[in-house]
Amino acid sequence: MIRKLHLGLACLLLSGGFALGQKLTADLPYVEGGHERQVLDVYVPESTKGRNLPVMFWIHGGGWQQGDKSDVHVKPKVLCDRGFVFVSTNYRLLPEVTMEEIVGDVAKSLAWVHREIAKYGGDPNRIFVGGHSAGAQLAALICTDDRYLKKEGVSLEVLKGCVPVDGDTYDIPKIIMTAEHRQAVYGGKMPTNGHRQKFGNDPKKHLHFSAVTHVAPGKKIPPFLILYFPGNPETRAQAHRLRTVLQAANIPAKAYGKADSNHGRLNHDLGKPDDPATKELFAFLDSLIEN
């Protein structure tokens, strides 16, 4: 069932503390007759009567095995304040479905947004994609491997920016090699629920699900802002790896590390006015909207 909620006095205006409202339409199915997790939420600024607002499409984390579209913290509030429509999607999870099907769900959800978001005041041709942790991998992949969206009849041209947050799987072969090298050097048990368990043992699939594999000039890949916690060597290395590959293909990309944080707090604090990563995010979005 689709739920409609009016969140009066829900958004704090960053410039002065005046509260704005937002309208949430929850649990919209993006696959007709689909799985209970093939649903998304749409947040719209209640006080804004304008149309063609830019859209932020958010993908939750949780190791591809858990998590929920409600894990957005203050992001919908502050982005509604800034004149965005905010969409948060669910997707089916491991081990019930394969990784290929998870990415396919994200593509189907994005295609729904492209088709339907104008009804909610959003611009179907100005969509930004972001996600945290596992959602960062999915965001980066969907913005670089155009096959998923092409299958749904959508071009990468409608994506105007990508904001992956603290992902460690933009280059899956490297993260697997890192974990196995560490185990060989320092000993201890290999993880029973690590990347090999999630992505399988086929090296071709490791490449297939790695965003860096698909980066190339001329594909209409959008600019990237890659946020990460520098205290984690894996996410730091992966952020810089993705940035380097993007820049080599002449795609605008910046990697920003927020030191006073951790994996969870980086996501939780994103959107707070005094947060350094938030300032980077707003500068990134503003520069692309103005262009």
Name each model feature, range by range.
Residues 6-17:
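Bacterial N-terminal signal peptides
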Residues 20-291:
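Alpha/beta-hydrolase superfamily serine-hydrolase fold, recognizing
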Residues 1-5:
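Positively charged n-region of N-terminal signal peptides that target proteins for export
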